[in-house]
Each structure stands twice: as C-alpha cells, then as structure tokens.
Swiss-Prot record:
One of its GO terms (biological process) is DNA restriction-modification system. It holds the Pfam family XhoI. Residues 188-202 have a biased composition (Low complexity). The keyword Transferase does not apply. It comes from Azospirillum brasilense. Residues 21-45, 161-222 are annotated as: Disordered. This is Type II restriction enzyme AbrI. Belongs to the XhoI type II restriction endonuclease family. Keywords: Endonuclease, Hydrolase, Nuclease, Restriction system.
C-alpha cells in the first residue's frame, strides 16, 4: 500500500516559514529583555520545529494509526537506553503498549556548520546505536522493530554547502566524506530514516554569524 504523505510539500513549506518566524520572534524578545546573546533555549528550539512535528503526526494519522498514542509532552518522551539509562525523544508513537516510532527534530543554522556537523553526526549515530542495542536486549518487549526517525532542517547557506578540507595524517579519509559538502551528504544515517532538508534564510530576517523499518519522507522543494 502506498504511503499517504498528507500534502507534505505544502505543509513543509509552511513549517519552514514558521521556523524562521519563530526564531525571529525569539530574537526580538531577547533584544527587548537585554539579553541578545542568550542563544536558543531548548523550549524555543522545540517550538521552532512544531510545524514539522505536526506534519509527521498528520502522516501517521493518514496511514491508519488512528488509535496510536502520540506523545509530545516532556514527561512522556523518555525511553530506556542501553549505554545510557534513558533518552529523551521529541515524539513517540505507541500503540497497544508497543513502541511504533521514535523521532528527533533538529535544526542547524550558521555559523559553525563544520563543528556542528560532527556533533550532529555523533549524536545521530550514537542515539540510533543505543536504541537498537536496547531493542535487541528486550528493553521494549516482544514488539516489531520500531521506526526511528531523525529529521534535520539545515540553512541553505554558502558555509553549509562548502566541501570540507579534512585531512587524516595516518589513514585516507573515505571517498564519501571527501565528495560531499558539509551537510550535502547527510541524507541517511544509522537512525533508519533520516533526511536533511535545506532551507534558505528569509531575506527579511537579519543574518547571524547557519535496520529499521524502511521508509522516508522526501525532502521538500522549498
């Protein structure tokens, strides 16, 4: 049966606009409070990605999981791990006491694309490996393999498209890491279904110094 994508292209465009709009509102609020360099708080980052959470929920509902429990409240987002005691996710889908899906929603804007790429890569791979090890060891009971998703919104900026000049004095870097820009090659990961979605910063916004169940949401055309 074909996957029902619930008009995802239109909703993705709206989610991108809401992302930048929420960031701008938070920036203005910080300036008014006299703390312009405070940076994004966790609750602000989560709010910025609310549109994408809603889009994923629409897709879940449109594909038959009408009875599923979809959790977004912090108190209900913790899963057991293996190498660490627990992991706090952004969205969990549970039906009949079985874990159906666990998803993370991340964003990356400038300026430190290179360093943050490494951090995000380690986070995605580590999170996935931890969850799958916990699953293998029976942390989630006798349930089918869950869907594990990692959705990342990346600012389409010159810095995020630059090819890295990494060198390794002892061994050759892999061809795939040399062939792709900083974020250009991040289209899949050990999380199972992971897509990077490039989005340009709106011109009106001031610029700051940017094996699981198969299935993926194509990157929207912005």
């Amino acid at each position: 049966m074909a996957l029902e994508l619930a008009d995802y292209e239109r909703k993705a465009r709206e989610s991108v606009m809401a992302f930048w709009g929420n960031r701008e509102k938070a920036r203005q609020k910080q300036q008014e409070s006299g703390k312009p360099d405070q940076g994004e708080r966790r609750r602000d980052r989560r709010k910025n990605m609310d549109g994408f959470c809603a889009l994923v929920i629409d897709i879940i509902r449109a594909n038959g999981l009408h009875r599923a429990e979809i959790h977004q409240k912090r108190a209900l987002l913790t899963l057991p791990g293996y190498f660490r005691p627990t992991k706090l996710w952004d969205l969990l889908v549970i039906q009949d006491r079985r874990l159906v899906a666990a998803l993370e929603f991340k964003s990356q804007v400038g300026p430190s694309f290179g360093n943050n790429f490494n951090n995000r890569t380690e986070e995605a791979i580590g999170t996935a490996h931890d969850l799958w090890t916990a699953y293998r060891e029976g942390a989630f009971g006798q349930s089918p393999r869950p869907f594990v998703g990692w959705l990342m919104l990346v600012e389409d900026a010159p810095e995020s498209n630059q090819r890295r000049a990494d060198t390794s004095p002892h061994f050759r870097c892999s061809r795939s890491s040399r062939a792709h820009p900083t974020y250009g090659g991040m289209t899949s990961s050990a999380s199972g279904s992971s897509r990077s979605s490039f989005t340009p910063r709106p011109r009106s916004s001031p610029r700051r110094a940017p094996p699981p169940r198969q299935g993926r949401i194509p990157s929207p055309r912005i």
